[in-house]
Structure formats: C-alpha cells, structure tokens
C-alpha cells in the first residue's frame, strides 16, 4: 500500500468527471487499499478517487471512530428518498482547514459495487448520507465550496493559493 498525494482546491484536476470502473480487479483493489491508507493518514472520513488524481468512480468511506467500518462504493448511483433537507458543516481533504455549512437531502439510497464487484444497496441517513453525497460530488467534478457563496469560495481559494506559494 502507498500514500497518495491529495489534490487541493483550486487544482483543475478536481473538476474532472470520473469514468465508470469497467472491471473490479486487482488493479482497482490496489487503488482502494491505497485510498484507505491515504484517507486514514490524512485523517479523513471519506475520499473519492478524483481527489488522488484517479478519475474513476471509486469512493472509500469510514465514519467510525476506530477505523473499523470501511465502506467501498464503485460506480455509485444515488436516489433521494426523503426531500427533507438539512444543513451539515462539511470539510474536505482537498480544501484543508475550511468548514462550511452545506444543505443536502437527509435520506438517500445508494446502489454501488463493493470491492469484490458485487452490487449492494444502502439507505443511509445523517452523517453517512452526507459523506456519500459529498464524495459522489467529487466524482462529478464538484466540491463542497460550490455550495457556498462566490465571495466565500474566492476567499477560500485565495487563502489556499497563498498557502501553496508559502509551501513551494
């Protein structure tokens, strides 16, 4: 396993729309393993392949305190089950150090493939539903900062660009 570099906003590669995984094989499972290692090391609770410059529809999530409930979503499809919206303060490994409230559906249904290529359906609510929606957005080239005002987004962009220059 290997730690993968995480792309940071405003990197244009984060806007790439991910392609479906055609076959779940050892190559894909190796990407998944590297993504989990990278996510846990960051530390984070979710990571989309787009964030590590792999433009395939792969998501890893683990919202547990002890990192013992890993979830893999390959080629996820999402349906809203409850139109009730709620606000949740979100952060992102690709937008480090920033947290903003985002409004999302409370209850969704996700259909995806697991790490063995088997289809499954999950109907999460709360934090897991938010996390899945956030990561699926990454696969579509969308970031949580797209949900905030243009002024806030530009402020975040400028601060991160300044940090990138200071690290260079």
Curated annotation (Swiss-Prot):
Gene3D superfamilies per UniProt: Peptide deformylase
NCBIfam families: pept_deformyl (TIGR00079), PRK00150.1-3 (NF001159)
InterPro entries, A to Z: Peptide_deformylase, Peptide_deformylase_sf
CDD domains listed in its UniProt record: Pep_deformylase (cd00487)
PANTHER family with a match to the protein in the record: PEPTIDE DEFORMYLASE
Record organism: Teredinibacter turnerae (strain ATCC 39867 / T7901)
Cofactor note: Binds 1 Fe(2+) ion.
Catalytic reaction equation(s): N-terminal N-formyl-L-methionyl-[peptide] + H2O = N-terminal L-methionyl-[peptide] + formate
Keyword set includes DNA damage: no
Identification of the protein by name: Peptide deformylase
Single GO molecular function: peptide deformylase activity
């Amino acid at each position: 396993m290997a730690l993968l570099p995480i792309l940071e906003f405003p990197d244009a590669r984060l806007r790439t729309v991910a392609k479906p995984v055609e076959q779940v094989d050892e190559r894909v499972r190796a990407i998944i393993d590297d993504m989990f290692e990278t996510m846990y090391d960051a530390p984070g609770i979710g990571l989309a392949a787009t964030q590590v410059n792999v433009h395939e529809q792969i998501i890893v999530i683990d919202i547990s305190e002890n990192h013992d409930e890993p979830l893999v979503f390959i080629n996820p499809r999402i349906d809203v089950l409850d139109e009730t919206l709620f606000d949740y303060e979100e952060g992102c490994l690709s937008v480090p150090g920033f947290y903003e409230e985002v409004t999302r559906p409370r209850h969704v249904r996700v259909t995806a493939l697991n790490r063995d290529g088997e289809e499954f359906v999950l109907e999460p609510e709360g934090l897991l539903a938010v996390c899945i929606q956030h990561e699926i957005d990454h696969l579509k080239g969308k970031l949580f900062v797209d949900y905030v005002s243009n002024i806030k987004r530009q402020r975040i962009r400028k601060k991160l660009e300044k940090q990138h220059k200071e690290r260079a």
